[in-house]
Amino acid sequence: MIFNRSVTYSNARLPYSKRSLYTKTRVLFFLKQKILSRVTTKMAIADLDKQPDSVSSVLKVFGILQALGEEREIGITELSQRVMMSKSTVYRFLQTMKSLGYVAQEGESEKYSLTLKLFELGAKALQNVDLIRSADIQMRELSALTRETIHLGALDEDSIVYIHKIDSMYNLRMYSRIGRRNPLHSTAIGKVLLAWRDREEVKEILSQVEFKRTTVHTIGSTEELLPQLDLVRQQGYGEDNEEQEEGLRCIAVPVFDRFGVVIAGLSISFPTIRFSEDNKHEYVAMLHTAARNISDQMGYHDYPF
């Protein structure tokens, strides 16, 4: 017998024998659902055990995170039962997630809960989606005006990451890809992302940077870079003058969020044979117009350039 949960059954109106049968049937139905759920979970765990160790560990972590997300706080015993893992395995994963800041344990309590770090990651992803959507039109207009490679880059720990790109219309052009990382110290976008940050924060970030020289023009130390960052902030744009790659020039400007924080750099990249110093300020003006429009859409209406 199959019960439709949208229908309300009045047990009190049935004769005693039928009420008893009805109750037993309902109990059997829900027991069946519970058993099926456990069987499905066991099958999933069995499949998980067949995975390579690295994949299996990742799946277990996400299983624990999902279970933690269903409760305000939960103990190891109950959590291990839910994810069908041993308590020692669950404890080991919890301690790792706790050290990374994704899980909290209140004092001496044996209860664990999720922190807001996952929310912060989601918020960053959402911000990047909004940023890319807002930037795309401006980047395409820049591409149409200059015919050169246009990049949007963001800070990720000690590097820049290209989060959007419009390719040059020329055959001779800068080759890159979305998701590619480049150094902070030798790129125009990197300098822009650092220039508007607090000096102590910049020093902390740069302490993790390996100042690798890729050309004779590459900046080789924090002491050499800091005065350049002051100039970048003063003039409103950063430059890569063959510092990352021989034969390549780049100009970048800042993009601000609604709080006035620089969240990205917008750039034009040129082969040196197509770059003219006489036209540099025209390119800077184009970039500022585009970055101002993007910043405005991100909620910042006081673009300084």
Swiss-Prot record:
Annotated GO biological process: negative regulation of DNA-templated transcription
A cellular component term, taken from the record's GO annotations: cytoplasm
Disruption phenotype: Inactivation of the gene results in constitutive expression of genes of the polygalacturonate degradative pathway (pelA, pelD, pelE, ogl, kdul, kduD, kdgT, kdgK and kdgA).
Domain HTH iclR-type: 55-116
Transmembrane spans: none
Residue range(s) of DNA binding per entry: 76-95
Keywords: Cytoplasm, DNA-binding, Repressor, Transcription, Transcription regulation
Chief site of localization: cytoplasm
Coiled coil: none
Keyword Plastid assigned: no
Molecular functions per Gene Ontology: DNA binding; DNA-binding transcription factor activity
UniProt-annotated location(s): Cytoplasm
Pfam short name (any one): HTH_IclR
IclR-ED domain: residues covered: 131-300
InterPro entries documented for this protein: ArsR-like_HTH, GAF-like_dom_sf, HTH_MetabolicPath_Reg, Tscrpt_reg_IclR_C, Tscrpt_reg_IclR_N, WH-like_DNA-bd_sf, WH_DNA-bd_sf
Domain of life: Bacteria
Role of this protein: Transcriptional repressor that negatively regulates the expression of genes involved in pectinolysis and in pectinase secretion. Controls genes involved in pectin catabolism, including the pectinase genes (pelA, pelB, pelC, pelE), genes involved in pectin catabolism (kdgT, ogl, kduI-kdgF) and the outT gene involved in pectinase secretion. Acts by binding directly to KdgR binding sites (KdgR-box) in the gene operator/promoter region.
Subunit structure of this chain's protein: Homodimer.
PANTHER family tied to this protein: HELIX-TURN-HELIX TRANSCRIPTIONAL REGULATOR, ICLR FAMILY (PTHR30136), HTH-TYPE TRANSCRIPTIONAL REGULATOR KDGR-RELATED (PTHR30136:SF7)
Protein name, UniProt field: HTH-type transcriptional regulator KdgR
